[in-house]
Amino acid sequence: TDLRYSTGNRGFMAKVLWVQNLWIEFYGVMTISALLRDHGHQSEISFGSEEEIVESIHRHKPDCIAFSCMTVQWQWAKEVTTAIKRSGIETPIVMGGIHATMYPEDAISHPDVDIICLNEGEYPMLELVQALDSGRGYSTIENLWIRQNGKVIRNPARPKLTAPELNALPFADRALYKKYDHFKNYPF
């Protein structure tokens, strides 16, 4: 059984499965999800134990597994990425968020993290998902560090988004979280 859930030229949208352990809405995840959605891609989110997350990956069959991780979550994220890879899943794992941005060498040094996204992730993630969907390479996408053939490709940072570029982003995809009872009455 091929446990790398890649669309590779099938002409359908790509899927990203966000994995998180904190029951709070992450604004960066919601803005990236909205941008992906507006370009025909799909995002889902998974909470739970390592076993529940692995089961969720099998159920959703994503093209990319993504974490937005604060340093306080780093130990948990390492354990979950190891459990995912140990289960035989080969889908690329992307680690973004403040930990990857502030401590990129630490983030990419974990052997079960395939890609880290530094700084703003909206357009790097869109480019990555488009590349995964089309079967194109993604080793030159700015803001991404990629583990490939045992080496790390450290792409340069792209310029930060300007105020007009930030204003042009779609509204946050709050529906990503609202399917969970915990968030249905969330006041924001």
Which stretches of residues belong to each language-model region?
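Short, Lys/Arg-enriched N-terminal segments with co-localized hydrophobic residues
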Residues: 1-12
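Glycine-rich beta-alpha loop elements in corrinoid/cobalamin-binding modules
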Residues: 15, 21-22, 32-35, 39-163
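Radical SAM [4Fe-4S] cluster-binding motif and immediate context
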Residues: 6, 164-167, 171-188
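Glycine- and acidic-residue-enriched helix-capping/strand-helix junction motifs
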Residues: 23-27
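Generic start-of-chain signal for non-secretory N-termini
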Residues: 11-18, 28
